[in-house]
């Protein structure tokens, strides 16, 4: 498992291409050859970029779901809707498919935000609004999620 670090602001051109920031590209370098999967996020109007190795781990888990249960089948269909494979080209650009640009409401300025083992791709205004909207709740959320005894030595 990888641990990506950083938040990067960049621009998307009219074709949906973004130049991957060099600091992020260095972190992703070991995974470049295998490519990436890009998809709609489940909880926000942003996109998620999975290194192929991380995607395969997730798919192995999803393959364990019983497809004869309607909820599982519905979840798989909706989770994988619009999923695309993408690569960083020789110029260091990543092409975001048009349908996903539309889903995320991406205009021109975007934010690439590390989320442990994936990268979230946000329209800059939506990202800032999301952080602003949830800032009051973050202390309570942090306590609820991380404030138990399950994490020995984590502070």
UniProtKB/Swiss-Prot annotation:
Boundaries of every SpoVT-AbrB domain copy: 7-54, 83-126
HAMAP family in UniProt: MraZ
Family: Belongs to the MraZ family.
Molecular function, one GO term: transcription cis-regulatory region binding
Pfam families, alphabetized: MraZ
Subunit structure: Forms oligomers.
Gene behind the chain: mraZ
InterPro entries, per database record: MraZ (IPR003444), MraZ_C (IPR035644), MraZ_dom (IPR020603), MraZ_N (IPR035642), MraZ_sf (IPR038619), SpoVT-AbrB_dom (IPR007159), SpoVT-AbrB_sf (IPR037914)
A GO biological process held by the record: negative regulation of DNA-templated transcription initiation
SUPFAM superfamilies according to UniProt: AbrB/MazE/MraZ-like (SSF89447)
UniProt GO cellular component terms: cytoplasm; nucleoid
Keyword Zinc part of the UniProt annotation: no
Keywords, comma-separated and alphabetical: Cytoplasm, DNA-binding, Repeat, Transcription, Transcription regulation
Gene3D superfamilies noted in UniProt: Transcriptional regulator MraZ domain (3.40.1550.20)
Protein name: Transcriptional regulator MraZ
Main subcellular location of this protein, as a coarse class: cytoplasm
Location within or outside the cell: Cytoplasm, Nucleoid
Domain of life: Bacteria
Matches recorded under PANTHER family: TRANSCRIPTIONAL REGULATOR MRAZ (PTHR34701:SF1)
């Amino acid at each position: 498992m990888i641990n990506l670090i950083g938040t990067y602001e960049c621009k998307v051109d009219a074709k949906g291409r973004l130049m991957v920031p060099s600091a992020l590209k260095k972190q992703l370098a070991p995974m470049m050859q295998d490519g990436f999967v890009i998809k709609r996020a489940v909880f926000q109007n942003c996109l998620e970029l999975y290194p192929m190795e991380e995607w395969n781990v997730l798919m192995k888990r999803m393959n364990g779901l019983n497809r004869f249960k309607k909820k599982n089948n519905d979840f798989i269909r909706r989770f994988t809707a619009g999923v695309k494979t993408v690569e960083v080209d020789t110029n260091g650009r990543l092409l975001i498919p048009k349908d996903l640009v539309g889903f995320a409401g991406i205009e021109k300025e975007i934010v690439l935000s590390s989320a442990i083992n994936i990268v979230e791709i946000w329209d800059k205004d939506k990202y800032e609004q999301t952080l602003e909207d949830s800032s009051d709740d973050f202390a309570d959320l942090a306590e609820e999620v991380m404030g138990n005894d399950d994490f020995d030595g984590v502070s």
